């Protein structure tokens, strides 16, 4: 009676060992994927934080029409003010077939036309300034701490999103929200700090204050 041969050779690798090896490789791949995906999420969070720095306010939404060959084409126009309340503000206009699309385009347009506003320690403006756009004329002047924003309409929105806390503004001429907002932007863009004014005039700061 012969006994069966139970001797194993090096080529007879157990199937279970191969399965464990494949599982380890799959876990490593999944781990690497999680790390890569984690980096993507961190990048998305940074982008969201940058976007959260900006505030958006809709000044006006109007339904407008354009006469074409087939008749009138209706759309929406949105006037949007964008600012970070730290000295940067912009006014944008967007047109689209729906309100959401018009506002989105207005925000993008406002970020393309940002103006840097010099602010004082008391969150006011350094000097008196005047801006004109079309038939609208806007006069803004600095105010003492605790005064607040004395302005109305779209001018107030522009000043608040620029981060100005104490200011006086007067609207002269046209009452159109878009022209008034753009006139306020012209006035803010023409502002200069005392140091810049002294350098342009070629005099010292002491002469500016005297």
From Swiss-Prot:
Family named by the database record: Belongs to the universal ribosomal protein uS5 family.
> What note about domains is in the entry?
The N-terminal domain interacts with the head of the 30S subunit; the C-terminal domain interacts with the body and contacts protein S4. The interaction surface between S4 and S5 is involved in control of translational fidelity.
* Positions of the S5 DRBM domain: 54-117
Basic and acidic residues: bias regions: 32-56
The family database entries (InterPro entries) matched by this protein are listed as: Ribosomal_Su5_D2-typ_SF (IPR020568), Ribosomal_uS5 (IPR000851), Ribosomal_uS5_bac-type (IPR005712), Ribosomal_uS5_C (IPR005324), Ribosomal_uS5_N (IPR013810), Ribosomal_uS5_N_CS (IPR018192), Ribsml_uS5_D2-typ_fold_subgr (IPR014721)
> Do you know which Pfam families this protein is assigned to?
Ribosomal_S5, Ribosomal_S5_C
Which purpose does this protein serve, as stated in its record?
A: With S4 and S12 plays an important role in translational accuracy. Located at the back of the 30S subunit body where it stabilizes the conformation of the head with respect to the body.
The record's listing under PANTHER family reads: MITOCHONDRIAL RIBOSOMAL PROTEIN S5
Q: Where is the composition biased (Polar residues)?
A: 1-11
Highest lineage ranks of the organism? Bacteria, Bacillati, Cyanobacteriota, Cyanophyceae, Synechococcales
Q: Where is the composition biased (Low complexity)?
A: 18-29
NCBIfam families referenced in this protein's UniProt entry, alphabetically? rpsE_bact
Q: Which UniProt keywords apply?
A: Ribonucleoprotein, Ribosomal protein, RNA-binding, rRNA-binding
Task: Look up the record and report any one GO term of the cellular component aspect.
Answer: small ribosomal subunit
Q: Name one GO molecular function term.
A: rRNA binding
* Assembly and oligomerization: Part of the 30S ribosomal subunit. Contacts proteins S4 and S8.
Where does the record place the region Disordered?
Answer: 1-56
Put simply, this protein is called Small ribosomal subunit protein uS5
Name its GO BP terms in alphabetical order.
translation
């Amino acid at each position: 009676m012969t006994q069966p041969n139970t001797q194993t050779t090096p080529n007879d690798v157990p199937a279970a060992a191969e399965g464990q090896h494949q599982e380890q490789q799959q876990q490593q791949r999944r781990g690497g994927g999680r790390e890569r995906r984690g980096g993507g999420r961190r990048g998305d969070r940074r982008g969201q934080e940058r976007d959260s720095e900006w505030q958006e306010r809709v000044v006006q939404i109007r339904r407008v029409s354009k006469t074409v060959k087939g008749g009138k084409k209706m759309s929406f126009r949105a006037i949007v003010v964008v600012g970070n309340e730290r000295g940067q503000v912009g006014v944008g206009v967007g047109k689209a077939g729906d309100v959401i699309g018009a506002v989105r385009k207005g925000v993008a347009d406002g970020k393309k036309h940002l103006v840097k506003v010099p602010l004082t320690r008391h969150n006011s403006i350094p000097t008196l300034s005047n801006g004109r756009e079309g038939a609208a004329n806007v006069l803004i002047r600095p105010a003492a701490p605790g005064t607040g924003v004395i302005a109305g309409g779209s001018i107030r929105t522009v000043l608040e999103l620029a981060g100005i806390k104490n200011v006086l503004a007067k609207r002269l001429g046209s009452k159109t929200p878009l022209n008034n907002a753009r006139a306020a932007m012209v006035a803010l863009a023409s502002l200069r700090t005392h140091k810049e004014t002294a350098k342009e005039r070629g005099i010292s700061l002491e002469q500016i204050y005297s």
